[in-house]
Amino acid sequence: MSDDKTSPMGLFKKYLTNRRIFKNREVLRHNYRPQILPHRKPQIDEIASILAPALTNETPSNILIYGKTGTGKTASVRYVGTELENASALAGTKCKIVHLNCEVIDTQYRVLAQIANGLDNADEHPSDSTRSHIPMTGWPTDQVYMELKNQLESSGGVMVIILDEIDKLVKKSGDDTLYNLTRINSDLKFAKVSIIGISNDLRFTDFLDPRVLSSLSEEEIVFPPYNAPQLCDILQQRAEMAFVEGALDETVIPLCAALAAQEHGDARRALDLLRVSGELADRENASGVAEKHVRMAQEKIETDSMVECISTLPTQSKAVLYAMLILEQMGKRIFTSGEVTVVYREIARIIDLDVLTHRRITDLISELNMLGVINTRVISRGRYGRTKEMWFDAATSKIEEVVTRDPRLDDERLKKLDVNRLRAMFR
Ligand SMILES: Nc1ncnc2c1ncn2[C@@H]1O[C@H](COP(=O)(O)OP(=O)(O)OP(=O)(O)O)[C@@H](O)[C@H]1O
């Protein structure tokens, strides 16, 4: 305490003096845009060849890009987009890229407004008083569409619209936006529009009108998952910029790569593992990052994502989960959906929740399984039909802590749950 008070940096001194691990941890963060993307040359070249006609003021084909999460789709498209803008500046042609994240911008109105406002660059058009800035709500959608067309026409040139996480837009607001955007070229004389849709969920195309799908997928590019040696190369390249020389034990990168490859070849996961391993070593003032830090990082990331996932569940799902925790506390390692339903009903009754049907509870159980919170399997019980069994994989103390953070489940009345009576019922 007195040390902290006497040092000018006080409490933070020890964090500033340990420079043995990181040189620049920012390069491991999600928002860092790498200049080199190992193992994505074929995809980058393909995107570039499809967009190249933009440099001679022709309309590039629309592209649909698929691939699992963390396979470098966004990073590659951004990279090609920047190169295209640079090349067009040199060639004296007009190409503009607008990148929208449809997880955030998920209605037709907002997509159209954002594209128009992306064009609405006052520096480029200082004397253009015909342009009006579209408010993010309030206008009729038709008016927004007209204004977008006007602005595209007055800008001229080629605009490439990147709709990242396009599946979220379709799920939230249907395919009207895509219908309008894929037809907009027929209404334009001086400008051209091309669309790149990016998704990690192939199923969204089932919800598209066949005409929209065929127009959107004039070209399709698939990003395969990375394997362990490829992830090693990606990590190696970032590690050189992020870590002090010699700070990483030689087993660290191969282990991060192997763990991320085992799951689904996700570069984001591999980079997170490497960054968190470094942070854990840094925090314990270690002289370097070792295998044990990677193991700790793996556990921390898993627990953090589980906590995040459970804390955002609705109260009914948490009540179902709470029923499973009670069954576990009663000494059961594996429980059936029938048992969960009995305990759940007791809980719902005590805390005045609407009591769900067995069918609905089974749906919530399947959802918990899909989220990886529990494991389930269906077993046949001969003439009694089939039933679902479930169990927890990991220690449940963290799950209980998160579930009981819900004010409805942190109820004094729940402490009166008659476990002995329940136990007798399952005998
Ligand atoms: N080949 C690569 N070289 C270097 N870094 C990469 C490479 N591929 C991906 N990354 C990095 O991994 C992270 C995830 O990549 P990106 O966001 O491009 O994935 P994505 O396929 O778009 O994922 P999602 O579908 O989840 O959005 C980013 O930090 C990115 O910089």
From Swiss-Prot:
InterPro entries: AAA+_ATPase, AAA_22, Cdc6_C, Cdc6_lid, ORC1/CDC6, Orc1/Cdc6_arc, P-loop_NTPase, WH-like_DNA-bd_sf
Keywords noted in UniProt: ATP-binding, DNA replication, Nucleotide-binding
Residues holding ATP: T71, G72, K73, T74, A75, Y226, R238
Database matches in Pfam families: AAA_22, Cdc6_C, Cdc6_lid
Record-linked SUPFAM superfamilies: P-loop containing nucleoside triphosphate hydrolases, Winged helix' DNA-binding domain
BP GO terms, sorted: DNA replication
HAMAP family per UniProt: ORC1_type_DNA_replic_protein (MF_01407)
UniProt xrefs under PANTHER family: CELL DIVISION CONTROL PROTEIN 6-RELATED, ORC1-TYPE DNA REPLICATION PROTEIN
Family named by the database record: Belongs to the CDC6/cdc18 family.
Protein known as: ORC1-type DNA replication protein
Name of the gene this protein is made from: cdc6
